[in-house]
Regions:
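Short Gly/Pro-enriched turn/cap motifs at secondary-structure boundaries
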Residues: 18-20, 210, 273, 334-336, ...
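A generic secondary-structure signal marking the coil-to-beta-strand transition
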Residues: 8, 24-28, 51, 78, ...
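Conserved C-terminal alpha-helix-loop-beta "cap" of PLP-dependent enzymes
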Residues: 295, 303, 310, 314-378
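Conserved PLP-enzyme active-site core in the AAT-like
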Residues: 2, 8-17, 79-311
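Glycine-rich beta-alpha junction loops
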Residues: 16, 30-36, 225-226, 288-290, ...
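N-terminal "arm"/small-domain region of PLP-dependent enzymes with the aminotransferase-like
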Residues: 2-60, 68
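Conserved N-terminal alpha-helix of the aminotransferase class I/II PLP-enzyme fold
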Residues: 38-90, 112-120
C-alpha cells in the first residue's frame, strides 16, 4: 500500500491487498485452524519465530486485514481487534498494568469505562484516580503516583460530548514517563487522529461509527509505535523483560515498535480470548468502506439539529462543540475542524416526566441502547 493516501482512499483500499487471483472483496475466513505441511513450521509459529496463522483465537486473516485498515486510518504501526469496545479498553490498559499498579483517567468517560476502571480493575489490584480533564496541568499532575502506568481519556466524551485537550494530556503523560491512551470512538480517525497530537495508543468501540449500521459488536486497539517503553523499562516489565511463556522472549527487543501489539495478541488474546468472529470483522470492514462519507453527513446533520435545539425555548441546554457558544468550541476547532461527530447531548426544561413524554412522542427517532449508527436514536 502506498504511503500518504487520503483517509477516504484508506477506508476502501487499506487492509486487504489481494494477490493475483485472490478475491477482490475481503473474504470471511471462517475457520478455527490452519493447515501446515510439517511440525517444524507449526513450532516456529507457536514460538513467534515466524509470522502466520495457526489458531483464530490469536489471529485470523479476515480480522487481521481489518485491523490493518484501522491502523492505517489512525496512522499507527499496528492494531488488534477485540470482541467489544469494553474489551479494547481493558486490554489496552491491562497489557501494561498488573496488580499493584495505578492509572489516571478522565472522569468524562463512558459509564462502562468508568466502572471498568473504578470497580472491576480494582478487583484485579489496579487502582484508578479520576480527574477533571478541564483542570489545569498541576491539578492533574497531583493525581500521579510512582506506580502510575497510564493516562486515559476520550476524544469526545460519551455521553457528555466534552472535548479532550489531547496535547495537554500528552504533555502530562510523557512528563511522568507513561503513555496516553485515548478512546477515539466518537470522533473516528476521519475527524481526529490523536497520534498527531501526542497520543500513544488509541482505542475504539467499532460497534459505533466504524460499523455504522448496528450490525456487529467489536473493538480495536491501535499503537502509534512512538512511545519508548525501554526509556522507563522498570515501569513496564511485561514489555521490557523476558516472557517465560515464550521461552524468555522480550517483546520490545524482538518486535521493536510492534512490541505492544505483539504482546496483546500473543499473550493477552492467547490467555483471555476476546477475539471477534471473522464474520463480525467482515461486517465491520463493509462499514469502514463508507466511513468517510457517513461522518461528513453525520456532522452536517448534527450541526443542524444542535442549532435547532439551541434556539428552542423548551430546551434548557445543548452540548455540542460545533456551536460557537459551546464550552468546547475552541478545542473542537483545534482537533476536529471538519466536525466532531453526530452525537448531541441536551436537556429539556422540566423534569423526568418531561423527558419521558418527549421520548415517547418521537415517531421516526428510535429509543435504543446505542449511539452512532445510520439511524437517529435517543
Amino acid at each position: 500500500m502506498k504511503k500518504n493516501l487520503k483517509r477516504s482512499t484508506l477506508c476502501v483500499q487499506a487492509g486487504w491487498e489481494p494477490k493475483n487471483g485472490d478475491p477482490r472483496v475481503l473474504p470471511i475466513i471462517q475457520s478455527t485452524t490452519f493447515k501446515y505441511d510439517n511440525s517444524e513450521e507449526m513450532a516456529m509459529l507457536f514460538d513467534l519465530k515466524k509470522e502466520g496463522y495457526f489458531y483464530t483465537r490469536l489471529q485470523n486473516p479476515t480480522n487481521d486485514a481489518v485491523a490493518k485498515k484501522i491502523a492505517a486510518l489512525e496512522g499507527g504501526v499496528g492494531a488488534m481487534l477485540t470482541s467489544s469496545g469494553q474489551a479494547a479498553n481493558f486490554y489496552a490498559v491491562f497489557n501494561i498494568c498488573e496488580a499493584g499498579d495505578h492509572i489516571v483517567a478522565s472522569n468524562e468517560v463512558y459509564g462502562g469505562t468508568y466502572n471498568l476502571f473504578g470497580v472491576t480493575m480494582k478487583k484485579l489490584g489496579i487502582e484508578c484516580t479520576f480527574v477533571n480533564p478541564d483542570a489545569d496541568e498541576e491539578e492533574i499532575q497531583a493525581a500521579f503516583k510512582p506506580n502510575t502506568k497510564v493516562l486515559f481519556g476520550e476524544t469526545v466524551s460519551n455521553p457528555g460530548c466534552n472535548v479532550l485537550d489531547i496535547e495537554k494530556f500528552a504533555r502530562i503523560a510523557h512528563k511522568n514517563g507513561v503513555p496516553l491512551i485515548v478512546d477515539n470512538t466518537f470522533a473516528t480517525p476521519i475527524n481526529c487522529r490523536p497520534f498527531e497530537w501526542g497520543c500513544d495508543i488509541v482505542t475504539h468501540s467499532t460497534t459505533k461509527y466504524m460499523d455504522g449500521h448496528a450490525s456487529q459488536i467489536g473493538g480495536a486497539i491501535v499503537d502509534s509505535g512512538n512511545f519508548d517503553w525501554n526509556a522507563n523499562a522498570e515501569k513496564f516489565p511485561g514489555l521490557c523483560t523476558p516472557d517465560d511463556s515464550y521461552h524468555g522472549l522480550t517483546y520490545t527487543k524482538t518486535f521493536g515498535k510492534m512490541g505492544y501489539i505483539q504482546k496483546l495478541v500473543a499473550q493477552l488474546m492467547r490467555d483471555l480470548g476476546s477475539i471477534p468472529s471473522p464474520h463480525n470483522s467482515f461486517l465491520l470492514n463493509m462499514g469502514l468502506e463508507t466511513l468517510h462519507l457517513r461522518m461528513q453527513q453525520h456532522c452536517k446533520n448534527a450541526q443542524r439539529v444542535a442549532e435547532f435545539l439551541h434556539d428552542d425555548p423548551r430546551v434548557a441546554w445543548v452540548h455540542f462543540c460545533g456551536l460557537k457558544d459551546d464550552k468546547f468550541y475552541s478545542l473542537g476547532q483545534k482537533y476536529m475542524p471538519n466536525g466532531s461527530c453526530g452525537v448531541i447531548a441536551f436537556g429539556l426544561n422540566g423534569d423526568r416526566d418531561t423527558a419521558i413524554k418527549f421520548m415517547d412522542s418521537l415517531e421516526m427517532i428510535a429509543i435504543v441502547t446505542h449511539v452512532a449508527d445510520a439511524r437517529t436514536c435517543v
